[in-house]
């Protein structure tokens, strides 16, 4: 094997003549074979690109036609070949001897056959798969330019290209899966190239490619015993601990108990709950028990990351198991046991199932294993073989990745800078990964190969760095040209100037040579006589040098290709005063970049004039260059006298400024300043400002400060380097710069206030502050003194340089190592330490080597920590602070020395002087450091107290027994009591009918008490049951039942039991149940596996049901289907089912007011622990009058809005049936996706907007501005005589500068105040009365609308579409039908409504455009418009429009007057009702909408629901209208707590019902306050007419006598009752002959009973007219619709005719004037004509097309404005 390996790897070093000889010989012989037809063509049925490289291709199952050889003659055997001198010379380095051509042909034939077939002897030690891997390995170790010499290189490259074409478009998951399962190294290499190529171009393919590439490069598909060795090691350690270390187990037991603390642990586990808070409490208690709270808080992030790593490895397990069953080949093995043991051992060591190619070697090794001893020996041999295979697989994997990366290092593949940077990062990652394996002792034999791989990657990294440097912007150098006559000393001055600019030797460039391989890249570059040759384009060369763009030099040597010009200072010399002529095209660019110094030597010039022809003596030159005169020209001076013309025309027109004379020192300083200024403005110093500290002092103190800093460095054993000036040198850590005030510096500056060199002898405490007078924070000082740049490994150790030990750790186990390393690491580094510690388990003797590698890829914390590790392999000292330094000693030392002082910084004192010299950032950093210290001291206690608070306040209900034992057999006590057959039947029947579990003794005692006339509750109920049983004694029949259980004799009931019909005395006098269950359509039964009822559940919507835990415990079914996705939170739980009930109930966290049957609930609603027969249960105690029974658990308790707030879970039993235990509703997230879009997002934080608590929206909808109301052309001069004007227009309106937003906010604030309303019991009793009263003329079970479009067409299409769709409904209609946008919105809401799910109750807010009284305009009062969602309006119309129509159809007789026409005979019916009353009260209310109680509105909605068919549409509409409304305006959403939106569907009917309920409650409360029990229906005792907030109360004398208390109660409910005319004073009875209702005065006129419209309402119709929207309402509209305006004024005249001729004449004059000025086309009627027309319309003789018969109108034309 080693010989073949050497041959393959050394083929590339064979001489070229040998290669050519082999090729020529093979070609000649092949041609001869074809001519003689003795060599058949090599054929291979290939199915994939890699088939040619394998005996049995791992990718396909294609058959092979093997090649029989390449020689026409007989060739020597392989054994003979290996003995030839040619073969020996091939394996040696010496190839100078002549090689025999025939031997070379024979060797090539054998190698070719070994690579193409498996029948060759060379394959005995090495299969073809291994040969292919070796060739790929050879490719990886060689530079790319040398790989063409490797055998089959071109064939492998072609195969990889074809694989690339097949897999390039595949997703990343597919490629990673192929890498994990593929055994073809060519395919693996191609896949790696695809992944890395897309990672380099992640901008195009996605960042996930780059992230996954980095992650996978760090992972090697290997198996180094990480599974087997830790398990065996742990077993051995545990066995040693129990036997050798502690032979007495009994002595060890107390220690174990004391360590585990089982009692405390058991109590913690016993109180654990499977909830979020429960887990927090339990884990905190366990951490506190074992004292690991603090460290657990620090490493929780690492644990989460580890969990995800485990998940990522799940697919690998599947692949291995699949390969185990699919990859075996049948073998003839006699010793199957050892064969199986070998396969298992191979898997445990290598992590791979042995393939068929390796089975033969396993079989050969085990062929002699016939005894136990021989089997053990064979197993040992196999273990060594498997270890070698494992290492080979690792090297193959690394080789494939190296080849992929090296092939990507090509400008045609990675072309842009971003791809090069990413390729560089990937190459570094792979380089570090290979470096890891060089430290692995198992891989030591492969270190030469690994080093070659690293060398290849070093070449890639170097190439990428060069390519990056070419594209990177560089610092612009400074170029000075020394011009002057020859011999004046320019070149010598240039050399001296270079020494003053830099300590380095200057680089020299000669422009006469076209290549610059000699350029060294030093800071100073000298170009002597740069313009001496006319053949050189020196101008462009200089322009390229003095530029920020990289300049690539022309170099001939291969290793210098890509060399860049990097010098900072360029000094050039020239004999010409004008190096570039001003007329040149490049003159401007040239002179802008250079500075010219005119150099003259007066001594030399005077000598030449005085003694021409003689040599210049040395005395004319001085060492300090004082003999030279250096005159610096101005900018862009092309000669001494002139400056370049900016226009490039006349270059001798602009005079040059006078020169500046310098010496050699000032010239050097000027060049430094020019370089700093030139580059400071464009590019800040990169990456080092955080590690540079400047100490500013005076020039005379520089040396003293430098010595003080060096003393501080020695005193604190610091890592910083002291530098004088802003320039920094290489340093292990930070750099401390001693600066003068004028020097620029990029870093942190500190001003030295004092420096005393005497303090060098005693530097103690705060040495920096005491010695330098500098106030530095502790963080800055620790960073300055101990920061370590990068990771440094020190092999040579000096004890006096070692840092002081802070911690000394003896490493007995890997856990000691991991625990100590925790102090050095950041959060991400701690996870890396866990992985490193796990790896150390396998090689504990190599800890120094492992630490050396581990620190290369670990992130360390910023705290300074020094730890000494005492390991079996020696001493390791680790120092970390940002970076890390490590010292590894192969021997033990007593103490690692070092200075023990700890640096301390200055403390910021706000009242002291130290803070004056510190920037604000340092002061705030000191504050944050203080807060961090406080947090570090209280973080554990904070967590414990938080968990303790959760434990004290958490809700912990437990399951409750439901009155049955688990065997479903009651306790049969009292067996000694003898019962007759009738008594026994009576006892059984009593327990069955009343669902009790009484024993025989208890039953007999109860019957005895009832017979004696006891008045306790149980005796009374028994007597009631006995009477009912006696009446129904004949309703039973004896039957015989034949079933699966056999023949049984039973008694069955022949008639159905019916509830007792309760009269008014019971119904209206008190609240008692049971009655009909709430949310009946949303309640379902939960059964067991046998179908027996266990309890109830409530549908929440979308197949999610709520119940209690003990009902759904065990096997539970709903509608015959097993429930799933069960989630619990205490006793409250939720589950899913595919069976969906027709309706859903809304849930709310609050206090209930009704039990499941409608009875009132009295409760404090506080969760407490209660002792029951099943143990302690935590729930809320409640009291109701309804008796419950086992099996009622899960029924809902509701609040006044019908929302479920709790579920029934237990009762007090027969002794206290009124006591109930209720589980409050708690939120459980069961969402799978968003149900419907809504504006109000509860997950967003609350904000305060002008005093309103609201949610911010993503969309902003502004409040419409302007008005459509304009002054009529007839009244532009006298419009102020009208009592009304258009409402305030906002901040620009001089009548009231209040903005529209402020008006809306002020109007919404009352809606955000809580309104209690009437008492609960009073309200529900009055609700019953009103239902009973309405049921006399409103039918029951009115069907809801089932067609969505039919319901939509019942709406007013002139109104808003609501918050989800802009505009009005008619704007989204085509040919009378809704368009797609509107239809999609309606369909989405209708779909939810048909499932009984409530919809978002949201409105868009606007302001009503109307006429308002002048005084209200000045106050800025406007009425809000609530634009309801069109989807909600459609659903409500479908649910309640028919019920509403049934109520309004009887307005003449009922209390609700919605729908009445006040211009019809209906007013006469109202008049008759008013006249029949004893006392009449006309009442109006101020701010009616905002003072409505939600409980009263919910009661009114329940009244509508009562008369409906209870369909899911009805449930959805009712639950939606009961939910709190949300007002949307100006980009915010406000959820109001009270009030009734004016735009709510059916608002007039609901408002009228509210009005009736309020009045009824006030009357009942007033009567019962006077000890008058109300046992009758109040609405049968008095009459009331309501239309929204307008009301007329017709009280009998008894009610009138307490009217003050009635109106007082109304005020107590939150209402604001007032007189109709808004005058101040008590509400008193009015004259029945002039009642004002709906702005109409109902009175008798000569024509009969009429409703007279208010006169001011008629008159203002003539002053204002509707037109276009504008802010200028005083200007008449541009266009007037004569038809609409004429109809409006015609109606006004008709209404005015009812007030008499005098008033009509006034109106007539206004009408005539309006016709004249407005150019209308009608003639105002005379008084008699108007009177006749009105009476005709009143009596129905003449139809009115403009008549409004709607719930929100007042029987006026649509253009007649309301008050």
From Swiss-Prot:
The record marks 46-47, 331-332, 685-686, 960-961, 1071-1072 as: Cleavage. Residues 1478-1603 form the RdRp catalytic domain. The modification O-(5'-phospho-RNA)-tyrosine is found at residue 984. SMART domains: AAA. PROSITE patterns: CV_3CL_PRO, RDRP_SSRNA_POS, SF3_HELICASE_2. Protein p32: Homodimer. Interacts with NTPase, protein p30 and protease-polymerase p76. This is Genome polyprotein. The lineage of its organism: Viruses, Riboviria, Orthornavirae, Pisuviricota, Pisoniviricetes.
